[in-house]
């Protein structure tokens, strides 16, 4: 370490003072001569005892540094375990923690949808660049690109086995891909406008799609034929999602409503209207969350003795709503996002809700207490989509900033 001339001068005077005041006369006079010190009584008072003071303060600082280092290690330990020491969190309570594990670049336009594969450690992203990309979420490696659509890919969905992938696009088609050979095996035509959403039904035999042409269509996987059309929405249908057993489908629209349809009869079982703007996204509650929801909302158990089903919706009115589909009641409204809500889903543990929005954040909600318990500044631009892995501790988000991010939960 190099001392400046002034620091060197001060140190020399402090050493001289130490030698003199401790009776090392001979050493003092030699040192004074060699260091070329001009002794000045007034000036030297300033350096009286300075060397000892510096010495003790260094020891004090060292002790303080060691204390802070051990506190930092403790905090790091707590951060990784997600709770105070010794209190390991239950995986049901794991939530995404910053910073992201990976930020994946490759798309050349906004990312529209991100989903995890149900079996393998891969995830898939769709983009306005007309491609679908496959990534390994554990290593962050890019695996391949699926090309075939000629316009923005709006939504993607796996069947339960992960062998088939469905995609839909602004090119007005739905494509079915063999996810083992990565080839397009079928293209379905029938919508008259942008196809904004697609989902493979739980039984794997049918696909549902929603479009800007205001309809929802059901297609046979085997033949690619359209077997049903659900009409009722008055404007662009933004998203369609089947419930766990495939007996109901929910849809949301620019007409500010959420509708629930009975698949067998095509009848509209419920029309949920409380949002004050376009409803962008919907998500069914898993059965693992039913008891927590009933507890949180005090919703009475029906005569059948079984609560639910429950549905979440996110809107451009910046709110998230939870609905009891059997009664058509809005059970709660979560307020906190500062812009359009673009994605919403239940945490697989059933106690929390995750959402993403055009305010560039990913949020975790403790719906029992109706509060936002964590906000992650997730992207540089609007966050368009999120997915939560069913079994592994990962969340993935996609954004208009063209990146896909993987978040670890703990």
From Swiss-Prot:
InterPro entries hit by this protein: Dynein_regulator_LIS1, G-protein_beta_WD-40_rep, LIS1_N, LisH, PAC1-like_LisH-like_dom, WD40/YVTN_repeat-like_dom_sf, WD40_repeat_CS, WD40_repeat_dom_sf
Gene3D superfamilies per the UniProt record, alphabetical: 1.20.960.30, YVTN repeat-like/Quinoprotein amine dehydrogenase
Domain LisH: 7-39
Modified residues (N6-acetyllysine): 53
Span list, region Interaction with DCX: 367-409
Keyword Transport found: yes
UniProt-annotated location(s): Cytoplasm, Cytoskeleton; Cytoplasm, Cytoskeleton, Microtubule organizing center, Centrosome; Cytoplasm, Cytoskeleton, Spindle; Nucleus membrane
An annotated GO BP: microtubule sliding
Region named Required for self-association and interaction with PAFAH1B2 and PAFAH1B3: 1-38
UniProt entry keywords in alphabetical sequence: Acetylation, Cell cycle, Cell division, Coiled coil, Cytoplasm, Cytoskeleton, Developmental protein, Differentiation, Disease variant, Lipid degradation, Lipid metabolism, Lissencephaly, Membrane, Microtubule, Mitosis, Neurogenesis, Nucleus, Phosphoprotein, Repeat, Transport, WD repeat
Residues in WD repeats: 106-147, 148-187, 190-229, 232-271, 274-333, 336-377, 378-410
Regions annotated as coiled coil: 56-82
Gene Ontology CC: one annotated term: neuronal cell body
Pfam families the UniProt entry points to: LisH_PAC1 (PF24951), WD40 (PF00400)
Tissues where the protein occurs: Fairly ubiquitous expression in both the frontal and occipital areas of the brain.
Variant or mutagenesis effect after changing residue 241 to P: In SBH; somatic mosaicism in 18% of lymphocytes and 21% of hair root cells
Region (Interaction with dynein and dynactin) location: 83-410
Phosphoserine PTM positions: 109
Role this protein plays: Regulatory subunit (beta subunit) of the cytosolic type I platelet-activating factor (PAF) acetylhydrolase (PAF-AH (I)), an enzyme that catalyzes the hydrolyze of the acetyl group at the sn-2 position of PAF and its analogs and participates in PAF inactivation. Regulates the PAF-AH (I) activity in a catalytic dimer composition-dependent manner. Required for proper activation of Rho GTPases and actin polymerization at the leading edge of locomoting cerebellar neurons and postmigratory hippocampal neurons in response to calcium influx triggered via NMDA receptors.
Family: Belongs to the WD repeat LIS1/nudF family.
Subunit-structure text: Component of the cytosolic PAF-AH (I) heterotetrameric enzyme, which is composed of PAFAH1B1 (beta), PAFAH1B2 (alpha2) and PAFAH1B3 (alpha1) subunits. The catalytic activity of the enzyme resides in the alpha1 (PAFAH1B3) and alpha2 (PAFAH1B2) subunits, whereas the beta subunit (PAFAH1B1) has regulatory activity. Trimer formation is not essential for the catalytic activity.
Disease in which the protein is involved: Lissencephaly 1: A classical lissencephaly. It is characterized by agyria or pachygyria and disorganization of the clear neuronal lamination of normal six-layered cortex. The cortex is abnormally thick and poorly organized with 4 primitive layers. Associated with enlarged and dysmorphic ventricles and often hypoplasia of the corpus callosum.
HAMAP family according to UniProt: lis1
Extra remark: Originally the subunits of the type I platelet-activating factor (PAF) acetylhydrolase was named alpha (PAFAH1B1), beta (PAFAH1B2) and gamma (PAFAH1B3). Now these subunits have been renamed beta (PAFAH1B1), alpha2 (PAFAH1B2) and alpha1 (PAFAH1B3) respectively.
Domain notes: Dimerization mediated by the LisH domain may be required to activate dynein.
Protein name, per record: Platelet-activating factor acetylhydrolase IB subunit beta
Origin species: Homo sapiens (Human)
Gene: PAFAH1B1
């Amino acid at each position: 370490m190099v001392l400046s001339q002034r620091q060197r001068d001060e140190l020399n005077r402090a050493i001289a003072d130490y030698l003199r005041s401790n009776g090392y006369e001979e050493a003092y006079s030699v040192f004074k001569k060699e260091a070329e010190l001009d002794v000045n009584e007034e000036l030297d008072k300033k350096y009286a005892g300075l060397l000892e003071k510096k010495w003790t303060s260094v020891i004090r600082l060292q002790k303080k540094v060691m204390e802070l280092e051990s506190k930092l290690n403790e905090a790091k330990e707590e951060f990784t375990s997600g709770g105070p020491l010794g209190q390991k969190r239950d995986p049901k309570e794991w939530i995404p923690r910053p910073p992201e594990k990976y930020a994946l670049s490759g798309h050349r336009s906004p990312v529209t949808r991100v989903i995890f594969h149900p079996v393998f450690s891969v995830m898939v992203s769709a983009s306005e660049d007309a491609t679908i990309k496959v990534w390994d979420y554990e290593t962050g490696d890019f695996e391949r690109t699926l090309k075939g659509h000629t316009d923005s890919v709006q939504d993607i969905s796996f069947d339960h086995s992960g062998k088939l992938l469905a995609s839909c696009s602004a090119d007005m088609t739905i494509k079915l891909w063999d996810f083992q050979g990565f080839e397009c095996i079928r293209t379905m035509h029938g919508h008259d406008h942008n196809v904004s959403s697609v989902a493979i039904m739980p039984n794997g035999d049918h696909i549902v799609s929603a479009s800007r042409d205001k309809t929802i269509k059901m297609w046979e996987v085997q033949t690619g034929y359209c077997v049903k059309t659900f009409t009722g929405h008055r404007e662009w249908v933004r998203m369609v999602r089947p419930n766990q057993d495939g007996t109901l489908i929910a849809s949301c629209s620019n007409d500010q409503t959420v509708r629930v349809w009975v698949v067998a009869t095509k009848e509209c079982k419920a029309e949920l209207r409380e949002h004050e703007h376009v409803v962008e996204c919907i998500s069914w509650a898993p059965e693992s969350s039913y008891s927590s929801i009933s507890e949180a909302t005090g919703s009475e158990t029906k005569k059948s003795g079984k609560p639910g089903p429950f549905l979440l919706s996110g809107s451009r009115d910046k709110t998230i709503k939870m609905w009891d589909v059997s009664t058509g009641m809005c059970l709660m409204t979560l307020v906190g996002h500062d812009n359009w809500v673009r994605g919403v889903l239940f945490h697989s543990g059933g106690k929390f809700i995750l959402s993403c929005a055009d305010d560039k954040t990913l949020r975790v909600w403790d719906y029992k207490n109706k509060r936002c318990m964590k906000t992650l500044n997730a992207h540089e631009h609007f966050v368009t989509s999120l997915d939560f892995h069913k079994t592994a501790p990962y969340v993935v988000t996609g954004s208009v900033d063209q990146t896909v991010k993987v978040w670890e939960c703990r």
